[in-house]
Amino acid sequence: MKKSLISAVTQALAVLCVALLGGCTKELTETPPSRRPLVVYMALDNDLRGEFSSRLAALRAGWRPGMELWVYADTPEGASLGRMDSTPEGVALHTVERYGEENSASGATLERVLRTVWRLCPSDGYGLLFFSHATGWLPAGTLGHPSGSRSVGSDHGSEIELESFSAALPEGMPLDYVVFECCLMAGAEVMLELQGRTPWVLASSAEVVAPGFRPLYESGLEVLTERTRPVPELLAAFGQSYMSHVEGLSGEYRSATLSLIRTSSMPALAEAVRRVTRGFADEEGRDTPPAGLQHFDRPGAYGDRPAAARFYDLEAYVEACLADPDAEAAFRGALADAVVWRDATERFLGGDGSPYKGFDIGRHSGLTLYVPRGEFPALNETYRRTAWWQATREEVY
């Protein structure tokens, strides 16, 4: 792991800079900010490095007086944490701390950033927008190498394991939501792991096609920092704005999935899934998933061999494994309670048969899950250690 390059002088200058910024940098006893502070975490020390300038410009365009917008960016030039503010020359990102070269795909780095904002900007609620590469619960590395452990962010090939990401969200910090501007993060495995860390997650079952949420920053920051409406209403509004934007695009760019998950409902959903499938008893002796299941990844598009789907629609798979019809109504209710909003285009990257290995979207429950298969014995073994597996596979008598 790369070492932090913070010096005592840099720390002193950072503290001085913070004192000059004002705004949120007050004592804990003072009144919290009128708007919800938003932390934008950009892990860009990878092939996303070219996104920094355009994203920073979009964030500046979306900032309004009274907003507490904190931006962490890790680029090949080094990492830093800044706070957006107005200057005589216009809106600018004031550097609060410089870190030099470091690994942003580290739970320790994410936790340090969140704790810094929590300390400098006391509030009774925060939001986190996380932008990077991601592969959901899948093993670290690439989609083409199914081995290792669950991953979220990417930095020069390093990735944050899912458990490390969850643990990096500080206990006690009132993190109202996480918005994943990342690929393949709306997995049941991910949401169960985040239960107890943040109550709401906005994420995509499929990949997020560039430029992602960037076109929404100018108008969307108002929504993400608002306090007057309930959090799920705000996130659904942000999500719907994104989907409306995508619906207005053409060709392969008209591709998106998005869902809003109540993480506190995930344990009940896992139990309902276990009961309705009798612990997925149907999986015994089966090497491949049932044919025709809706999936949200693009097998073969990542250099993966063998090329096989790994992100299936949760509802579609449960229906294929239905073992207790009397428990079906409870499952439907638990799913509706967990997924409070969802939307998707009719096809992704051109749909079935496209040169981009896209797919049609006939089903979209808002959650995905992995289905064990014979081609991936190491991946199957890793999957058996996830909280989702353990919560759903015990046989029901």
Segment roles from a protein language model:
Residues 29-31, 115, 136, 143-397:
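Terminal, contiguous helix-loop blocks that mediate binding/assembly
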Residues 34-37, 65-69, 121-127, 172-177, ...:
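Loop/turn elements at helix/coil->beta-strand transitions in domains of secreted/extracellular proteins
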Residues 25-122, 383-384, 389:
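N-terminal extension/subdomain marker
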Residues 72-95, 130-156:
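Surface-exposed loop and adjacent secondary-structure segments within mature catalytic domains
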Residues 2-13:
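Bacterial N-terminal signal peptides that target proteins for export
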